[in-house]
Regions:
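Interaction-mediating elements
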Residues: 1-212
Length: 212
């Protein structure tokens, strides 16, 4: 080691994940708290926690659980469900945490009207309407709206509209009904201008294109 040089050793000791002392969901009325706790990843300590490790707090898990709770409610008709606040407090010994999630369930909604609007290109509107799985009289479900969006964009993509978009937008009415409008933008149809094969040393490009 040359004069003036020093060796510096840095030891990094990662802190242990805090265990969950108590997890509470405030504002749940339509569903029992036990039912909501069953669908999320974070758990109270149990006999199986020592190998599942599901009673350890992690910010990423909490964020995912908040999304899970919201999706659960919005698939059960609660279109205006909202998570009002989330509080995480740690015990004095920094070994455990208390988690409190405050929610506003809102009201349940029933689908009253479904419309398809936007730029459809040369696609017949009825062909796209047949792909809509959200129907009048159904309990509002965000999952069905998302699935319809995927069906519409997939169908348009298969028809050459590679950059097509579809967005289902609910309008909530005071009478407990929801109007759903699917806004579609087919965009421009994409065409294949040329197919080039690489690596073939025997068959000519023209023959391969003709056979494909």
């Amino acid at each position: 080691m040359a004069d003036g040089e020093k060796i510096i050793k840095i030891n990094i000791e990662e802190g242990k994940s805090s265990g969950i002392k108590h997890l509470n969901i405030v504002g749940a009325k339509a569903f029992e708290q036990r039912e909501l706790l069953d669908i999320i990843e974070l758990k109270h300590p149990s006999l199986t926690s020592f190998y599942k490790n599901d009673d350890k707090y992690a910010r990423e898990k909490l964020s995912g659980d908040l999304e899970t709770i919201e999706a659960f409610y919005k698939d059960q008709g609660y279109a205006d469900f909202d998570i009002e606040s989330t509080q995480v407090s740690i015990t004095p010994d920094r070994q455990q945490v208390y988690i409190s999630i405050a929610i506003d369930e809102g009201d349940t909604y029933t689908v009253s009207d479904v419309n398809l609007v936007g730029e459809l290109g040369d696609v017949k509107p009825e062909d796209l309407r047949n792909l809509i799985i959200v129907q009048e009289g159904q309990i509002f479900s965000q999952a069905l709206i998302t699935a319809t969006e995927e069906r519409l964009t997939t169908a348009l993509g298969n028809g050459g509209f590679t950059f097509a978009t579809a967005s289902g937008v609910p309008r909530l009415n005071d009478d407990g009904t929801a109007d759903i409008e699917f806004f579609v933008d087919a965009g421009k149809r994409a065409y294949v201008r040329r197919i080039t094969f690489t690596g073939n040393q025997v068959t000519q490009d023209e023959v391969m294109r003709r056979e494909s």
